[in-house]
Regions:
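Active-site substrate-recognition segment that forms the wall
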Residues: 1-122, 181-192, 197-203, 207
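C-terminal lid/capping helical subdomain adjacent to the catalytic/cofactor pocket in oxidative enzymes
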Residues: 118-207
């Protein structure tokens, strides 16, 4: 169903030993997402596991087969990441402690897919997260619980419908043509079932 819409991509992360470790403690160094001439990078303070951890979104833009993807990190991977650290975080650019590969699974617009199956509306799914799903795990879990229990959710997930990537007319969706959340306690109809939601405070989009 997601063939061609969920594209696996090889990623590489580095852990470097800071030469100025006092600058990379969690109380002084933030989680960052940095867009620079070389691309978009993300990283974290030293926490739990030793080392300044960071990577580059889309790394070398290598589309891979998950069954045969290169799981080794190479000298050219290390050079790309160290060049970034030397320029922007020189105090974090000590010896390389570790390099690890992983995969992002990206949609064409880099957004999530959260919806009901177009042919089997009793099935809900959440994939892929395009490399930025972890920080939304709690609310995605809430959305998926809503969909599993009622087929709709109080969160506005219209941005993440499957049909934005496929054909606009062939599915029941988690976001039909009425609000997914009632603020006045009125009922809405979906699939011959009445759904009623009590008044709740306005919910801001989670993305």
């Amino acid at each position: 169903m997601l063939d061609g819409l969920a594209v696996p991509e090889r990623q590489v992360l580095a852990w470097l030993q800071p030469t100025r470790p006092e600058h990379f403690r969690p109380d002084v160094f933030p989680v960052f997402n940095l867009l620079v001439d070389e691309g978009r990078f993300y990283g974290f303070p030293v926490f739990g596991v030793p080392g300044f951890k960071f990577g580059k979104y889309h790394h070398l833009e290598e589309i891979v087969d998950p069954e045969t993807a290169d799981r080794e990190a190479h000298d050219y991977d290390e050079k790309l990441l160290r060049d970034f650290a030397e320029r922007y975080f020189p105090g974090g650019c000590g010896p390389t402690m570790d390099l690890q590969t992983c995969m992002f699974t990206n949609t064409p617009d880099n957004h999530f897919v959260l919806d009901l199956h177009p042919d089997y509306p009793q099935v809900s799914f959440a994939s892929p997260c395009s490399g930025h799903g972890y920080k939304f795990a709690s609310v995605i879990g809430e959305v998926m619980a809503d969909l599993a229990e009622t087929g709709i959710t109080r969160h506005d997930i219209s941005l993440f419908r499957l049909d934005r990537l496929t054909q606009p007319s062939r599915r029941p969706s988690a976001m039909p043509d009425f609000p997914a959340r009632s603020t006045d306690g009125e009922a809405y109809e979906q699939n011959s079932h009445s759904r009623s939601f009590p008044r709740v405070p306005d919910v801001r989009p989670f993305w």
